[in-house]
UniProtKB/Swiss-Prot annotation:
This is Uncharacterized protein UL6. It comes from Human cytomegalovirus (strain AD169). It is a single-pass membrane protein. Keywords: Glycoprotein, Membrane, Transmembrane, Transmembrane helix. The chain crosses the membrane at residues 239-259. It is found in: Membrane. Belongs to the RL11 family.
Amino acid sequence: MHAKMNGWAGVRLVTHCLNTRSRTYVALNMLAFARTPRGVPSCLFNKVWVSRYALVLILMVCASESSTSWAVTSNRLPNCSTITTTAGQDAELHGPAPLSCNVTQWGRYENGSTPVLWCTLWGSRTRVSLGHRVAFGCSWKTFFIYNVSESSGGTYYQKGYNCTDKHITLSCFNLTVVPRAVQSTTTVMTPTVVTNSTFSVSLVASRLTTNSSAFRHASYQRQQRVGNGTLSKNITNLAFTYGSWGVAMLLFAAVMVLVDLGLPQSAWRRWRSHVDDEERGLLM
């Protein structure tokens, strides 16, 4: 009875201390309200409580790793710098580096005040959010937007993590996209003398234009491949991490079930009795 009260008080204390984390709070309450079946010996009861405390620690680690890593809070915007670019060009948004931790987030405010996360850098990892229909890239201090259009305009932000559960807005940018000017041409009928030099210059100019377009296309494709490779690498890392946690929890549960059923103890007793029988046979 004393052990039961101590275990109950311990789980309730941990539940009270961690009541700010919803998933962990629900899991801890499920473990706390679980009752030991009648007729179970005290040694098994202690093992059950040991397993419960171990599961509590695992849930605490999982909750701390995944619950607040990607939270984006909406706060008051600082004074945003205005950046103007022409449609079809590339835009670069330059911001400061994070002061205390090596985590940086880039995103855009939708509907005026709702932050939507586009890119996150932490340590040597990068997480990119897809579905924006915009070719972009990010680094610690710069956010790149390639071949901007009028729909690319808006308010973009940079946030730095300050080693706690709060995100600090480092800078924001009001990106204005100006339509490309339409060149007016006047047709003047003048006699033209076609020579070999004129034909050669026209041919060289067309080749340069073609090569420039091909280079920009190849550069964009290369950037797309790099982004897709980074994203697939991040997905693989996340799958490996959470898969490892799942395998570890399953193995731990299997070991605790075997211990509760008494299979290791019975196997040890049988082996000891077999050894004792052999020793008695040798003595006789």
